[in-house]
Amino acid sequence: MPLWLPDDETFASFWPGDNPSLLAALQTMLRHDRSGYIYFWSREGGGRSHLLHAACAELSQRGDAVGYVPLDKRTWFVPEVLEGMEQLSLVCIDNIECIAGDEPWEMAIFNLYNRILESGNTRLLITGDRPPRQLNLKLPDLASRLDWGQIYRLQPLSDDDKLQALQLRARMRGFELPEDVGRFLLKRLDREMRTLFLTLDQLDRASISAQRKLTIPFVKDTLGL
């Protein structure tokens, strides 16, 4: 399956917030282990896809073969896409909650998990929107397997952390986000990070086009607030 991932979603661009243990576990696995399994969960927009993209990017830069399977887009492919993935250095399965109750997909993931265990040479990262035991899977053995490894909740960011995350993204794109503007965005917009990042990108383009710095009046005019 072809792999197209955002080139700006790396560990360097991820604001950790209250998630140092998860970040440390991921980086230890990627940098020092040849195998292992980590499951982490959060609500939608909590940053789990970003971390999977970051993991793929880190190993790809080292020349390792990786696989990323976004199950929210499973209609684009079939369960057989998982065949042979145990030969990769890293397999990332995103949004596993999307296949709960889908027996062919559940069986395909269960079989892949077992093949990865047997190979002993593949790292496996799986994300969901809830803990493994709450996924309402039809296959009890898969639920049991998912509960075996390291399990983390990806903690949501506080408002202060969201401001820091926005300012980090701005710096990585080559501009500054003043604190008052950032707090204005948090006050007036949906606080889900995906929405905030898309809005920040929109403001970046608008400020370049208008050759103006980001100020609250400029943001109000641009966003119609």
From Swiss-Prot:
Gene that this polypeptide is encoded by: hda
Pfam families noted in UniProt: Bac_DnaA (PF00308), Hda_lid (PF22688)
Subunit structure: The active form seems to be an ADP-bound monomer. Forms the RIDA complex (regulatory inactivation of DnaA) of ATP-DnaA, ADP-Hda and the DNA-loaded beta sliding clamp (dnaN).
GO biological process: DNA replication initiation; negative regulation of DNA-templated DNA replication initiation
Top-level taxon of origin: Bacteria
Protein's recorded name: DnaA regulatory inactivator Hda
Keyword annotations of the record: DNA replication, DNA replication inhibitor
Protein's UniProt keywords contain Secreted: no
Organism: Cronobacter sakazakii (strain ATCC BAA-894)
Membership in a protein family: Belongs to the DnaA family. HdA subfamily.
Function recorded in the entry: Mediates the interaction of DNA replication initiator protein DnaA with DNA polymerase subunit beta sliding clamp (dnaN). Stimulates hydrolysis of ATP-DnaA to ADP-DnaA, rendering DnaA inactive for reinitiation, a process called regulatory inhibition of DnaA or RIDA.
